[in-house]
Regions:
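A short, Lys/Arg-rich alpha-helix, primarily the initiator
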Residues: 1-26
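DNA major-groove recognition helix of helix-turn-helix/homeodomain DNA-binding modules
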Residues: 46-69
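Extended, low-complexity intrinsically disordered regions enriched in serine/proline/glycine/threonine
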Residues: 11, 98-102
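Short C-terminal boundary/hinge segments that cap the last helix of small helical domains
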Residues: 62-78, 291
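Conserved binding/catalytic microenvironments
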Residues: 101-105, 110, 114-412
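Recognition helix of helix-turn-helix/homeodomain-like DNA-binding domains
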Residues: 22-49
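Domain-level recognition of soluble alpha/beta enzyme cores
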Residues: 72-94
Length: 412
């Protein structure tokens, strides 16, 4: 007990004396040593249980119990630490450390959100947009609740914020596919803000990828160019979002009839394309099929329709070779519509109508497909107003576009 009492920093000396009295009585010492210097050395050096010094200390303190005044450190040759006199304790430091690691999150809360972000990205095109919105929106609200209504560590907060941003990117894509302009921009804004706070600039870049695509199909190429440039300014070097935004920049220059810039940027993109897989599904992936599709659209805008046919057919071939073609129905439909536009310009409307029917046969008529098909139908009517196949296609298109875009996609 004496050893414990001596080693407890800041223990009041009257308590220490009481402990010594108990120990001295138990050991029944008959000889009393009065060498206080040896006692002081024992205390200051830490002492060991096997040392005999505690017995001398017991004798001294037992004798001192008869004193009127309580014992002081000087009575034992022991100097109390300065910081202890100021009220500093190890317990206070331990409390600070505990505060830094205190969390109300359950094991798996963050990991579960991370998993669903990957799942939503990979299986995006296999779910009805209405169903998908409900699922992603619930997860986004869950992330918000964990951030605002639960205690968490700074590290956990940063990761939750990053995941919240990625969920908002997915919600922005759904809003884009539904043609919801204000909602798309709002979720892009939120994703950018979350990425900045989480110091996850790839989230910011992905938000600008959505904003760029949405503005392009909405007929605002300069807004799309601004978004691509902004995204590239923060995209981490070597990240696939950087290459995707570079490819976006190439087709935007084509859309703006800037042939030389398109050629330069597309050459830069091609230097990386050999390292890409031919086809890969998901919102956050990039493959050679996407680049071929981007090039087909670009060549149509530049008026190079024969080259556009080749690029569109390459993209279509890549998508059809996918183990699960239904995982990229929108990109496949866009490539088929680009092929139809090229055939229209080359004077073969029957092939144009055939390619367009294949594009609309996938059953997932998102806003970008609707806009592209309406443009195609306008070009066909402008050039071949008397052709029966063109009139029939116009009626079919109106029927297709009247269907509920929230309906589940048709099985492949």
């Amino acid at each position: 007990m004496l050893e414990e009492a001596v080693r407890r920093s800041g223990l009041p000396y009257n308590e220490l004396a009481a402990a010594v009295r108990e120990m001295a009585a138990a050991e029944g010492q008959s000889q009393i040593a009065t060498d206080r210097s040896r006692v002081g050395h024992w205390i200051n050096d830490g002492g060991r249980p096997q040392d005999p010094i505690p017995r001398y200390l017991a004798a001294i303190l037992t004798k001192a119990l008869s004193l009127t005044n309580p014992l002081t450190p000087a009575d034992l040759g022991f100097k109390e630490p300065v910081l202890t006199q100021l009220g500093a304790t190890p317990e206070e430091a331990h409390a600070y450390a505990l505060t830094a690691t205190t969390t109300d999150l359950r094991p798996g809360d963050i990991e579960d959100l991370d998993l669903v972000v990957h799942q939503f990205g990979a299986l995006y095109s296999t779910k009805a947009l209405g169903e998908l919105w409900g699922e992603v929106d619930r997860c986004r609200k869950r992330a918000h609740s964990l951030l605002t209504h639960h205690r968490h560590t700074l590290r956990e907060g940063r990761e939750l914020t990053r995941l919240a941003g990625m969920l908002s990117v997915i919600l922005a894509w759904i809003a884009h596919d539904l043609g919801e302009d204000e909602l798309t921009r709002a979720y892009c804004d939120d994703a950018w803000a979350q990425g900045i706070e989480a110091e996850a600039l790839d989230v910011c870049a992905w938000s600008e990828d959505v904003r760029c695509t949405h503005a392009l199909y909405a007929g605002r190429p300069y807004d799309a160019l601004a978004a691509a440039t902004r995204g590239l300014s923060v995209a981490p070097a070597g990240n696939r979002v950087a290459l995707r935004l570079t490819a976006q920049l190439a087709r935007l220059n084509a859309r703006l009839k800037n042939r030389s810039a398109f050629t330069d940027v597309m050459a830069q993109v091609r230097t990386h394309s050999d390292r890409l897989p031919l086809h890969r599904s998901g919102l956050f992936d990039l493959d050679a099929a996407v680049l071929a599709s981007y090039e087909a659209s670009s060549l149509i805008w530049l008026g190079d329709h024969r080259e556009a046919v080749v690029a569109a057919e390459v993209a279509i071939g890549h998508y059809r070779a996918m183990p699960q073609p239904q995982l990229a129905p929108t990109r496949l439909a866009i490539a088929q519509l680009d092929l139809a536009l090229a055939h229209t310009a080359l004077g073969i409307p029957e092939q144009a109508v055939s390619a367009a029917r294949e594009a609309l046969g996938g059953g997932r008529i998102v806003d970008s497909v609707r806009r592209r098909s309406e443009h195609l139908e306008y070009r066909l009517r402008l050039r071949y107003p008397e052709l029966r196949a063109v009139r029939d296609f116009g009626e079919e298109l109106r029927d297709q576009l009247s269907r509920d875009v929230l309906a589940p996609p048709r099985p492949a």
